[in-house]
Amino acid sequence: MPNLSGLKTEISSVRNISKITNAMQLVASAKLRKISKKVIDTHNYVSEVYSLFNDIIRQTDKSVFLKESNFKANKTLWVVINSNLGLCGGYNSNVNKLVLQNLKLEDEIFAIGSKAVSFFRSKKIKIKNQITDIDINFTNKKARSISNDLLDMYINHEFDEIKIVYTKFINNVTFEPAIIRIFPIIKLENNFKHSQSLVFEPDAEQILSSTILIYINAIIYGTIIESQVSEQASRRTAMENATNNGKNLEQTLSLKYNRQRQGAITQEISEIVSGANNKS
């Protein structure tokens, strides 16, 4: 006799898991709506800071923060942004894979998110610092704390290059890992948005030194917010796919159950009829 009770249990398990993934999809959607409101403002702010600082560095060649475009780093600190939670598709693995592709022997990791901590610890890669207090409520205050740490490391020559690896948000279904160099700052060419009308006093070099923390903070805050949006979008997509797959599997198992149940009933009827005929 077919194992109908086993199939029934399996159908029930799949149905319950689908309910859980659907609930997680709804939670991720709500978080995505909440944090998406910050993205446009953050993009505009970071863009303006980038443009302004490019204008500043175009007018100085002596700052400790500047290097030529052919600069080669011996030791790099990689600031890696992951999530604290799983079930978000390839969000973490794509970022970590990009880091591993570029990592040198002497490099170290500044891990943001518990998944980054556990991943690079498992790879026996040195973690210089770690931050796990990160979610959709990430604030500028927290970003400033990270920015201060990075600035101190660079000024004290612990690293000759600092890069951040995050997930760039393109739209609700498209996001990709990306790298931004924080230090040293490489001059960008052909940016005349502000430079033709701005005059820096006392001079661009002093202004750069006194406001460099604004530059770092804009990058840290912007990339973490963008990564948070990407995380929630990735989790929503992953849970939506899991829910749909669960429903499809439930339908397949239900069809199999009904066929086996129908076969079992038909067999029982045949046995009853056969027994009645034998008695007659």
From Swiss-Prot:
GO terms for molecular function: ATP binding; proton-transporting ATP synthase activity, rotational mechanism. Transmembrane segments: none annotated. It is found in: Cell membrane. GO terms for cellular component: plasma membrane; proton-transporting ATP synthase complex. Pfam families: ATP-synt. NCBIfam families: ATPsyn_F1gamma (TIGR01146). F-type ATPases have 2 components, CF(1) - the catalytic core - and CF(0) - the membrane proton channel. CF(1) has five subunits: alpha(3), beta(3), gamma(1), delta(1), epsilon(1). CF(0) has three main subunits: a, b and c. Belongs to the ATPase gamma chain family. HAMAP family: ATP_synth_gamma_bact. This is ATP synthase gamma chain. The gene is atpG.
